[in-house]
């Protein structure tokens, strides 16, 4: 499963490798069908289907976002995906992708920052300290060399949890009282 793979390889290696694959795919941008995601919105959240193909492989990801799920003991986000061979239409992979979604999001963010952030930046702010922020922190350290993190969330408990979970990573962590800090 994905978590065993991440633990065996190491999260920094997974994030770094993902960023390389993402960058390689950007270099093949013109080959991809760029179909907008299909979204179904409800008062409780959103379900999205994200299809694409490079002409050889067709793939899609199904992902939801239901913020109040945690009050019922459910995950806020769940995802799965499928890859199929375009030449014969046969599925070649069906995979749970919840953790991969978090990793890919973080790797993509850090890859963008690699090109867009000021050269030599070592400090960043994480505004909103839910589960994704921990993946972001590790990706930005691995891909961009970030060493100092400033945390802010309207839920102080989220900041405390993120800082606790990242406390042994060697990053310099600072809790902030406002987004301006």
Question: Can you name each region flagged by the protein language model?
Answer:
Residues 169-181:
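Short acidic low-complexity segments
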Residues 143-169:
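NAD(P)-binding Rossmann-fold cofactor-contacting core
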Residues 133-134:
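N-terminal Rossmann-fold NAD(P) dinucleotide-binding loop
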Residues 125, 149-150, 174:
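A structural signal for isolated positions on well-ordered beta-strands in alpha/beta enzyme cores
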Residues 137, 141-142:
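Gly/Ala-rich phosphate-binding loop of Rossmann-like dinucleotide-binding domains
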Residues 1-102, 110, 117-120:
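N-terminal ligand-binding/catalytic initiation module
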Residues 129-130:
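Glycine-rich Rossmann-fold phosphate-binding loop(s) that bind the pyrophosphate
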Residues 116-123, 145:
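Short helix-loop-beta connector
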């Amino acid at each position: 499963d994905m978590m065993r793979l991440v633990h065996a390889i190491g999260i920094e290696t997974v994030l770094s490798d993902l960023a390389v694959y993402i960058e390689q795919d950007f270099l093949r941008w013109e080959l991809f069908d760029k179909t907008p995601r299909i979204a179904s919105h409800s008062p409780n959240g959103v379900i999205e289907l994200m299809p694409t193909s490079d002409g050889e492989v067709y793939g899609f990801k199904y992902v939801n976002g239901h913020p109040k799920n945690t009050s019922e003991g459910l995950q806020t986000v769940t995802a799965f995906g499928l890859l199929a061979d375009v030449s014969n239409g046969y599925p070649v992979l069906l995979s749970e992708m919840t953790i991969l979604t978090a990793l890919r999001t973080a790797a993509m963010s850090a890859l963008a920052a690699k090109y867009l952030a000021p050269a030599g930046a070592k400090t960043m702010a994480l505004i909103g300290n839910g589960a994704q922020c921990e993946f972001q922190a590790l990706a930005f350290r691995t891909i961009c060399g970030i060493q100092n993190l400033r945390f802010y969330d309207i839920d102080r408990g989220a900041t405390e949890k993120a800082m606790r979970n990242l406390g042994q990573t060697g990053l310099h962590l600072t809790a902030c009282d406002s987004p301006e800090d």
